[in-house]
Amino acid sequence: MKKHILFYSLIAIIFASCSKDNNETNILEKPKEGTEEPLKPSPNSVKSVNGGFYKPNVGGPNQPNQVFIDLSTGEQTAVKRDSWDFAFLCDPKDHRVILNNTIKMAAKKLETTNIDEVQDIDESVVVGPSTAQTLGYVDSPYGAFVNSPTGTAIKKISEKNDENKVYLVNMGYDVGVKTPEIGAISLDEGIHRGWKKVRVIRNGDDYVIQYANLRDKTHKTMTIKKKTTHNFVYINLEKGTEVEVQPEKTKWDISFTAMTLYRNIPQTVTYFFGDVVIHNLRGVKVKKIVTNSQTRDREYDAFNKLSADNGSNEYFKESKHQLIIGTTWRNTQGGAQLLDNVFYIIRDGDGNLYKLKFASMVNEKGERGYPVFQYDLLK
């Protein structure tokens, strides 16, 4: 059920044989690495493109970028994974803070509300197979906005500020630059970013984050206001500023990233993975289609709107978390391999329906971090 996809000559043949809808004009260019420009709005109220072959700018075997893709415009936004620290939920009915789970951050609740108390490093607050999911040190990779251990590591921010505790935060790692062997990835070889103590409180509907180094007896603060146009507001503590990461919530559908997931070995532990694909929980739905390697491509070609029940809510009823694609499109045991028995159906926030399958996860040299996928508008 698996095959190595190491031959870009095959991709070239496929490109040459595509229909007019998938010809060279629809082979989408990569943006400059690290671009953070917001996507431009479409002049049409209902946006759609026919699709094509797509190369997300993941950035190679260190996978330095989070890449957000709008299928309806063909635009992507690539942002360096270590450019942000915390993200603040913009839901008008909730107050949640998430860690940067793309650089192995972790957090432990302390039994104090005094941010100026001196704290010590706790080496157990890490991402890895020694850290059980039940400890609640990381955010749920499924995107659940409930309290840990099945939701966010930082508890929901209360209106009663005396209920908002200080957290000991392992700030994770800078994106590394070490070049791994061909076919491998190097995701956490960068410099450790140290430790912080952090407390988040509320001022009306705004967030206020208090933060300091562990031994400091004074702290800094930032106030974060929600944006109705976005899922989250992101901040960088070192700069003391907000930073642009996700595009507006209506302007991306899927994202390629490295991130902390759960793994059963045999208990459920935290584990860091590359080549992960998530989808936007605000309006996007995904369904995985499992077939077999002999018929997958024929079934993909034949799949149309009617096959997807015209995108009904019932058809997408299992799309309840952001990891429907996740890592289910590839396998890395014995080398970088695609699973050639699956494809995916995606409904974007405008109601457009797409089918998507993966064509490669490596470049012509066999290096990971260069995925290619094909997607087509359902008709």
For each feature predicted by the language model, list its residue ranges:
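Positively charged n-region of N-terminal signal peptides that target proteins for export
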Residues: M1-I5, S19-K20
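C-terminal motif of bacterial Sec signal peptides marking the signal peptidase cleavage site
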Residues: I14-S17
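Surface-exposed, beta-sheet-biased, low-hydrophobicity segments with strongly acidic/polar composition
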Residues: N22-K379
